[in-house]
Regions:
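Charged, amphipathic alpha-helical segments
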Residues: 1-3, 45-51, 93-94
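Extreme N-terminal tail/first-helix region
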Residues: 1-15
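A generic structural signal for nonpolar/aromatic side chains embedded in well-ordered alpha-helices
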Residues: 9, 54-55, 94
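Short beta-strand segments
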Residues: 12-47, 55, 61-65
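A short, aromatic/hydrophobic, helix- or strand-capping loop or linear motif
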Residues: 19-21, 66-68, 104-109
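Solvent-exposed residues in well-ordered beta-strands and their adjoining turns
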Residues: 35, 46, 66, 84-86, ...
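Helix-adjacent hinge/juxtasegments
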Residues: 51-80
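Charged, gly/pro-rich active-site loop segments
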Residues: 73-136
């Protein structure tokens, strides 16, 4: 994964994730921590939330992380990922970034990235990442 993508992920903390719904698509927001070794975004949520129920049923999801609303300064990351339960190491990564999460009654999930497109209008280019080791 390109260093510019890693830096962008590490410098942000809120993502939007989209998943399939009976009526089309559904979207939710979540704070995240980054598991760089496994190229996964870690989130906390209730297992009863609509987005977790939908993503558990159809784990191929889309993610957006964006910054700034001025076109010349626009930076954003469009991601395709697999939704799965987080492991113990990933929970620790999340707690390191969001200590308050220890007080939450939540489950933790890993959004394992298999494709990413980073747009940075300042650079005037797009940077891609693809993990062909993940079977969809």
């Amino acid at each position: 994964m390109n260093d510019k993508i890693i830096e962008f992920i590490n410098n942000n903390r809120l993502l939007s994730l989209a998943m399939q719904d009976n009526d089309g698509v559904y979207i939710a927001n979540a704070f995240y921590a980054f598991d760089i070794l496994n190229k996964a975004l870690i989130i906390a949520s209730s297992p009863n939330s609509k987005h977790v129920r939908l993503a558990t049923k159809a784990p191929n999801i889309a993610i957006n992380i964006a910054k700034d609303n001025k076109v010349p300064l626009l930076k954003g990351l469009q991601i395709k990922a697999i939704f799965e339960k987080a492991n113990e190491k990933q929970k620790k990564i999340y707690f390191a970034k969001f200590a308050f999460a220890r007080l939450m009654n939540a489950e933790f999930y890993a959004l394992r990235i298999y494709f990413a497109k980073f747009t940075n209008n300042i650079l005037g280019q797009k940077i891609y990442f693809e993990n062909k080791n993940i079977i969809i």
